[in-house]
């Protein structure tokens, strides 16, 4: 009893049972109280470890006896979270603790060393990343959380955790460049690769951490510096999905925006990267699996069908890992990404796959049952054969139904293969299978045992062990002659087998069987050691072995692969002996062959011909130096073939396909550069286009199409794949009434008819299919189709149709949903107003979240709607509001407008889709029911609303209000903003830059209310709406004449640039700016005191984000950006023309070009939405003499221009060395370039570089270290409003919000701050500097102890010195400064802090600090308690007390804007003087 208790205290019960029969194995059983996990062998030893609940146990005798691992001073007991072995060092292992202490061994578990870290470990996954060459180099991924905000720091060690350092404070996965021994075996590496680390980081300003980038560092990200990996032809790539090491390759996957397509990038030296080509096939999200690969190629399973029955195609790369060839179609796969593919261990070129024979049925009906058959290849996938058991076909369960640890079919035992399956037409269920064996690497098979069994190999195949796997058993089976005959051995206990394993190299005669006994509440677990050492009495001699060929060809002769035949020394099946060479891996004998066609692959710049027999140039070949003076010349170049690296075939007497051959210099010729703009005019027999949409190809795609879909007013559909050079009619006679592009996937377009039939393309018009819905389109002007925002759920649809609308019935709208692209539909909700998928995002964690508006009482005549949501297709539902007008879903917020009584509205917001909070509108804001609001934007961590305050037709205007970061508390940003009858607002945010927006305000509000026409003025913000100013006009017009007014440094009400905006556009897609042309905007307007008629306007451009504007053309033009702003085309909007103007230098010079001999009235000019193409499309009608009827399109192709024929060069490590420079946007009122608390630095093409940008790439180079906070980083808080001097004051008669609310809203809150009238702009990341949003902290109720701990005060002598010494010092310094200062003491305006100037300037700390402290002595007695806490907080703000630096990562792609992680710097002068004491000079007023 005492012994049992002692064992229980160690959480392990030991009981031994032994058998000693000579004709069977020796069996030892250890009983466990808890199920063991993480069992592993130290390679080439009998030492085994496992985890037992919260303890680690070790055995040094192959599992016969076990002892707890105690660690130094027995500290490990009861503290183990997980155990891991080092995959490349047989002596190392790691025990990770539940807290901050962990242990490591480097002597196979004999001794353990303890190390402690400051961070916690992630909840799941292996946090360790290993170096493939130096086993002392390890990366440890950790996590740090503060409230609901978590970051993931990474640590690294170069001495096996004898010491460790912070690698980076925020990452999404880091790995050594040399991550495998195969990669480390490369003979030569670029410099510094040995220490190179690659990490995934949150993208720069990625709103909710969705986009990630890949950076590398050779100095462990010293100084928070890293370089973005140049994946795409030397350029970085956004939105990285994953990065892994595969044998001798590094593989990174990236996602293209607005599509489900992925791109795969491969490197074999961690320096040069190439995009993988998949033989015309496309990769999709969660659509590929890196399979077991070789040292000379990568195998990838690419998903070819989705749904619940996925299938994959097998692709094999060349030796560079770049060019992939399709080997097999319709491989069986599962939803976890596993593919039924496995190589035979130790033998090159042989692998088994499972394929689906009824794949057409599965693709058509996703819920069908697969018919799976097994195939085997003996020649690296070139051909596949049936697996034969006698004369019948054998089918085996593979990776998708794995039932044991380790490999499925084979082990290092040469040629021995086992599997569970059945003979017949297709694979049956696992429990209907039997155990089959092959001893010739899969050529022939036989049934070894009835029923399904787990199995394992020992002594290089001399012993095969199996255990029943369909239920409980008390025996094992084993074979000593390659599985032809079997014996059984009784187990002392009856178990359900869980794992059967042995040493990784299968050279041992000892096995471990893990199983579970009977019962559920008191279930026992067992580790059973099986030892076959005594079954045979003798060790094998020379005559017991054979020279066994690993591969045979169709003539059953030894076959060649990679230039050699492969043989093994293997024990004969009938020999009654054991090899007994423990831990000595079987070594193949290689016999070289003469070279054949199979030993060669296509050389770089070459691809396989269509018949797969030759290698042809993939692109124009490089010109050999000193050759090819004339096109008709000849030169000696590559044959197109090369010997596969690593292939050791004998060339003498064999094929020499890589022998250089004579080529024509015409192969090197590039596409001719005509030097002219190409023009293609196409006419249509229709009056006008009804609608047209670009289906832009994915950014990372290798496709070249530029697809546009067009629906004419005659309801005819046309498609172009070459940007309008040619058009073809599609879906003729199908009665298409509406084009409906997929909101989140550019590859998908729906063609809606007036009935139930819908047509669809999923590949930008390459093919079409049709499906039927349950109902025809609705009649309530509701969106017919709604899409899921997740690219992986692109087939999830909501269709809103009309029901019971015939003959005056109860006509209403019904929503149906489909998860398979429209094949099957299910009712979602009846009597709906509108339904939308919300999906994951931010704190929303489910894909099934749907919101619907539904008529109250399910009565379509009832115009009151309620808002409901569900996470299970409305099997269960939640009612959020009972009387709403409408709702909107956005990236971070869900916004709803609901009635609050008879004559007012209320707005609710949610970030999690579950809990809504009513918005707190600014004071004096009473939104009447008959008035309106417009959701403007939610991309900068806040919601922008326009609330109409005057709603008379043609006289509408309102106020823009902006929310806090959770969308609930709104402050007034700007009043009297223009709106039109259709509820559109003159508001536009600049694309590509943070926080810049333009609006038009009504200048004559009083007159407009009385019925007068509006007079509009344009205003701009550079800090996300916290401050607005009039736009500063240019000094001269396009003809070089001065304007009639000159405002000075900034625009004024009397003299500003006023621009025609959103409410006047024909097409709302025609914006001022472009996301790819950073800093550029074009607009039409005029200089003066208000906006005049558009017909009287001129055309203007800005190149610096709206600070300086230039008049470029007299008159009203429409414009379009091309090649990311390196080409801009303008054309007259209001008059017929034959010409366009274009600029190649951002509007500094303009060139006129005649594109037609017949005048045309142009209605629009377009290009691809990303503005990256060199092609443009004019839409218009011919007028005047020679005009043709109907409308026409004109393609303008600028790719023939010499100035745009060469691709620009960008090197991330030297960004200004070639065709680009670094540009920093700035605020016009600041002397430095800090915006939103940081300096953003962008790549921009040099205007004089004669080249083209090409595909879209990330313009943001990096974000520098965070800046000190200034007034521009704050906006007015709730119930406060901005004054004329830029300060924030409480609205008369109102009170601040109760600051204690945070204590109830956040249970983890320790303190709250006294309201100051200011709050941080949600977008800012500033640190230190001016702190305006919280001077004085108070403890939350019942959190006094925590508050004191966080803010320890000064007492006694310390307090005395803290007061007296600064005053004395300040007096001395103040006297000296006063006599030398350039001015008198005056008022300091709030927040007008300069970051530069002399020591004696007004903002010098030598002046400001003494002023603050001397002034503070006046109130020192009343401020004593406050000062004590203030001194501590100030000290903590300047010195890193109790925490590391909070500076986020500053290099490109790694900047994680940790909003909410701010250092609380208290400015003593602010706290003592109060905000009202700050003022400034007249020339510094805001």
From Swiss-Prot:
Keyword annotations from UniProtKB, A to Z: Glycoprotein, Golgi apparatus, Membrane, Protein transport, Receptor, Repeat, Signal, Transmembrane, Transmembrane helix, Transport
Glycosylation site list: 295, 966, 1262
GO aspect biological process, one term: Golgi to endosome transport
UniProt cross-references to SUPFAM superfamilies, sorted A to Z: Oligoxyloglucan reducing end-specific cellobiohydrolase
Topology class, membrane: Multi-pass membrane protein
Record GO cellular component, one term: membrane
Keyword Magnesium: no
InterPro entries: Sortilin_C, Sortilin_N, VPS10, VPS10-sortilin, WD40/YVTN_repeat-like_dom_sf
BNR repeats: 57-66, 376-385, 436-445, 478-487, 718-728, 817-826, 1100-1110, 1141-1150
Main location: Golgi
Positions on the Cytoplasmic side per record topology: 1378-1405
Subcellular location field: Golgi apparatus, trans-Golgi network membrane; Prevacuolar compartment membrane
Signal peptide per UniProt: 1-20
Pfam families: Sortilin-Vps10, Sortilin_C
Classification via SMART domains: VPS10
Topological domains, Lumenal: 21-1356, 1427-1486
Transmembrane regions listed in the UniProt entry: 1357-1377, 1406-1426
Taxonomic superkingdom: Eukaryota
Role this protein plays: Functions as a sorting receptor in the Golgi compartment required for the intracellular sorting and delivery of soluble vacuolar proteins, like carboxypeptidase Y (CPY) and proteinase A. Executes multiple rounds of sorting by cycling between the late Golgi and a prevacuolar endosome-like compartment.
Family: Belongs to the VPS10-related sortilin family.
Protein name as catalogued: Vacuolar protein sorting/targeting protein 10
């Amino acid at each position: 009893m005492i012994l049992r208790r002692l064992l229980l205290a160690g959480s392990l019960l030991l009981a031994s049972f032994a058998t000693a029969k000579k004709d069977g194995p020796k069996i030892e059983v250890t009983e466990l109280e808890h199920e063991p996990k993480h069992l592993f062998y130290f390679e080439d030893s009998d030492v085994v470890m496992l985890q037992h609940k919260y303890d680690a146990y070790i055995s040094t005798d192959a599992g016969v006896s076990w002892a707890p691992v105690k660690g130094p001073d027995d500290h490990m007991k009861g503290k183990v979270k997980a155990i891991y072995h080092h995959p490349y060092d047989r002596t190392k292992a790691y025990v990770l603790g539940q807290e901050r202490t962990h242990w490591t061994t480097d002597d196979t578990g004999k001794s353990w060393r303890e190390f402690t870290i400051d961070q916690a470990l992630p909840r799941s996954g292996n946090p360790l990343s290993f170096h493939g060459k130096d086993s002392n180099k390890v990366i440890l991924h950790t996590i740090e959380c503060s409230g609901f905000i978590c970051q993931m720091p990474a640590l690294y060690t170069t001495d096996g955790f004898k010491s460790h350092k912070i690698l980076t404070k925020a990452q999404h996965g880091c790995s050594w460049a040399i991550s495998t021994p195969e990669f480390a075996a490369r003979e030569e590496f670029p410099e510094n690769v040995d220490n190179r680390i690659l990490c995934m980081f949150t993208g720069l300003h990625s709103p909710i951490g969705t986009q990630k980038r890949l950076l590398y560092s050779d100095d462990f990200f010293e100084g928070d510096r890293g370089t973005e990996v140049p994946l795409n032809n030397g350029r970085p790539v956004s939105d990285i999905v994953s990065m892994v090491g595969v044998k001798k390759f590094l593989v990174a996957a990236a996602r293209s925006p607005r599509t489900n397509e992925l791109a795969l990038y491969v490197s074999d030296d961690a320096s040069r990267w190439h995009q993988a080509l998949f033989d015309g096939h496309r990769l999709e999200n969660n659509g590929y699996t890196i399979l077991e690969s070789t040292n000379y190629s990568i195998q990838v399973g690419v998903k070819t069908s989705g749904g619940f029955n996925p299938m994959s195609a097998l692709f094999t790369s060349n030796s560079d890992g770049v060019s992939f060839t399709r080997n097999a179609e319709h491989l069986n796969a599962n939803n976890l990404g596993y593919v039924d593919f496995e190589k035979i261990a130790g033998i090159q070129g042989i692998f088994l796959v499972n394929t689906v024979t009824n794949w057409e049925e599965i693709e058509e009906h996703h819920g069908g049952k697969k018919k799976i058959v097994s195939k085997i290849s003996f020649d690296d996938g070139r051909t596949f054969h049936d697996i034969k058991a006698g004369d019948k076909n054998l089918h085996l369960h593979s990776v998708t139904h794995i039932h044991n640890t380790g490999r499925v079919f084979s082990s290092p035992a040469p040629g021995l293969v086992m599997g569970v399956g059945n003979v017949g037409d297709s694979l049956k269920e696992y429990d209907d299978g039997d155990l089959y064996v092959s001893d010739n690497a899969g050529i022939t098979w036989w049934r070894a045992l009835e029923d399904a069994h787990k199995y394992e190999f020992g002594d290089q195949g001399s012993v095969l062990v199996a255990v029943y796997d369909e239920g409980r058993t008390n025996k094992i089976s084993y074979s000593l002659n390659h599985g032809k005959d079997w014996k059984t051995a009784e187990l002392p206990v009856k178990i359900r087998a869980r794992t059967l394993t042995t040493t990784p190299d299968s050279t041992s005669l000892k096995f471990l069987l893990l199983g579970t006994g009977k019962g559920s509440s008191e279930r026992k677990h067992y580790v059973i050691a099986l030892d076959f050492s005594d079954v045979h009495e003798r060790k094998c001699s020379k005559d017991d072995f054979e020279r066994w060929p690993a591969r045979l060809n169709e003539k059953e002769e030894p076959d060649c692969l990679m230039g050699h035949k492969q043989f093994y020394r293997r024990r004969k099946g009938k020999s009654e002996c054991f090899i007994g060479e423990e831990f000595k891996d079987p070594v193949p004998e290689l016999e070289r062959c003469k070279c054949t066609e199979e030993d060669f692959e296509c050389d770089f710049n070459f691809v396989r011909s269509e018949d797969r027999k030759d290698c042809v140039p993939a692109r124009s070949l490089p010109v050999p130096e000193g050759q090819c003076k004339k096109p008709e010349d000849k030169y000696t170049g590559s044959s197109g073939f090369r010997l596969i690296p690593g292939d050791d075939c004998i060339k003498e007497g064999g094929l020499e396909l890589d022998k250089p051959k004579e080529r024509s210099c015409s192969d090197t010729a590039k596409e001719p550069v005509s030097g002219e703009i190409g023009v293609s005019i196409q006419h249509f027999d229709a009056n006008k286009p009804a609608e047209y949409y670009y289906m832009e190809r994915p950014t990372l795609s290798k496709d070249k199409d530029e697809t546009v879909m067009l629906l004419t007013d005659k309801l005819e559909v046309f498609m172009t794949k070459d940007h309008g050079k040619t058009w073809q009619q599609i879906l003729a006679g199908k009665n298409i009434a509406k084009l409906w592009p997929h909101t989140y996937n550019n590859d998908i377009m729906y063609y809606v008819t007036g009935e139930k039939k819908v047509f669809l393309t999923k590949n930008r018009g390459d093919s079409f299919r049709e499906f039927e819905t349950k109902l025809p389109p609705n009649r309530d002007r509701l969106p017919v189709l709604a899409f899921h925002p997740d690219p992986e759920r692109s087939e999830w649809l909501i269709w809103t149709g009309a029901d019971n609308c015939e003959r005056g019935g109860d006509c209403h709208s019904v929503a149906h949903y489909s998860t398979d692209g429209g094949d099957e539909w299910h009712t979602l909700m009846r009597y709906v107003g509108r339904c939308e998928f919300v999906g994951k995002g931010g704190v929303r964690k489910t894909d099934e979240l749907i919101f619907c508006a539904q008529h109250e009482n399910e009565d379509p005549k009832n115009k009151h709607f309620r808002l409901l949501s569900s996470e299970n297709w409305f099997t269960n539902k939640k009612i959020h509001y009972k009387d709403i007008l409408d709702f909107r879903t956005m990236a971070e917020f869900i916004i709803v407008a609901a009635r609050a009584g008879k004559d007012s509205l209320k707005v609710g917001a949610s970030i999690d889709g579950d809990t809504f909070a009513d918005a707190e509108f600014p004071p004096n804001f009473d939104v009447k029911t008959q008035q309106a609001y417009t959701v403007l934007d939610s991309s900068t961590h806040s919601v922008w609303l326009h609330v109409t305050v005057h709603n008379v037709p043609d006289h509408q205007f309102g106020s823009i209000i902006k929310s806090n970061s959770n969308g609930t508390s709104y402050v007034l940003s700007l009043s009297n903003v223009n709106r039109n009858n259709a509820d559109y607002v003159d508001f536009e945010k600049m694309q590509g830059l943070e926080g810049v927006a333009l609006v038009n305000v009504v200048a004559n509000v009083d007159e407009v209310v009385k019925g007068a026409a509006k007079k509009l003025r344009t205003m701009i913000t550079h800090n996300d709406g916290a401050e607005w100013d009039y736009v500063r006009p240019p000094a001269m017009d396009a003809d070089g004449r001065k304007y009639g007014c000159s405002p000075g440094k900034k625009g004024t009400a009397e003299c500003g640039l006023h621009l025609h905006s959103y409410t006047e556009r024909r097409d709302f897609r025609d914006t001022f700016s472009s996301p790819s042309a950073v800093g550029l905007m074009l607009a039409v307007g005029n200089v003066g005191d208000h906006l005049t008629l558009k017909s009287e306007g001129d055309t203007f451009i800005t190149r610096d984000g709206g600070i300086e504007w230039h008049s470029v053309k007299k008159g009203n033009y429409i414009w379009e950006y091309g090649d990311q702003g390196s080409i801009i085309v303008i054309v007259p909007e209001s008059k017929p023309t034959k010409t366009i103007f274009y600029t190649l230098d951002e509007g500094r010079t303009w060139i006129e070009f005649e594109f037609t001999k017949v005048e045309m009235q142009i209605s629009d000019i377009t290009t691809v939405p990303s503005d990256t193409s060199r092609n443009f499309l004019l839409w218009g009608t011919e007028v005047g003499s020679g005009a043709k009827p109907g409308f026409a399109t004109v393609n303008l192709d600028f790719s023939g221009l010499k100035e745009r024929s060469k691709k620009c060069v960008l090197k991330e490590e030297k960004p200004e060395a070639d065709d680009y420079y670094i540009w920093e946007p700035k605020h016009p009122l600041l002397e430095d370039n800090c915006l939103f608390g940081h300096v953003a630095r962008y790549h921009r093409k040099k205007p004089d570089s004669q080249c083209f940008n090409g595909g879209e790439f990330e313009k943001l180079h990096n974000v520098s270290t965070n800046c000190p906070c200034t007034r521009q980083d704050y906006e007015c808080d709730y119930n406060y409003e901005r004054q004329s001097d830029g300060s924030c004051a409480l609205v008369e008669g109102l009170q601040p919000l109760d600051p204690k609310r945070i204590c109830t809203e956040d249970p983890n809150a320790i303190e709250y701050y006294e309201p100051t009238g200011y709050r941080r702009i949600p977008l800012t990341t500033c640190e230190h500097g001016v702190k305006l949003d919280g001077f004085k902290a108070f403890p939350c109720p019942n959190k006094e102890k925590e508050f004191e701990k966080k803010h320890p005060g000064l007492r006694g002598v310390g307090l005395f010195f803290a007061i007296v010494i600064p005053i004395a010092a300040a007096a001395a310094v103040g006297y000296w400064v006063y006599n030398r200062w350039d001015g008198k003491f005056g008022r300091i305006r709030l927040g007008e802090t300069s970051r530069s100037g002399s020591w004696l300037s007004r903002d010098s700390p030598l002046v400001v600090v003494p002023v603050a402290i001397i002034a503070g002595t006046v109130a020192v007695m009343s401020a004593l308690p406050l000062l004590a806490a203030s001194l501590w907080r100030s000290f903590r703000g300047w010195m890193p007390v109790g925490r590391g630096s909070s500076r986020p990562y500053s290099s490109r792609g790694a900047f994680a804007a940790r909003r909410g992680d701010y250092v609380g710097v208290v400015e003593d002068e602010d706290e003592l003087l109060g905000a009202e004491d700050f003022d400034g000079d007249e020339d510094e007023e805001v």
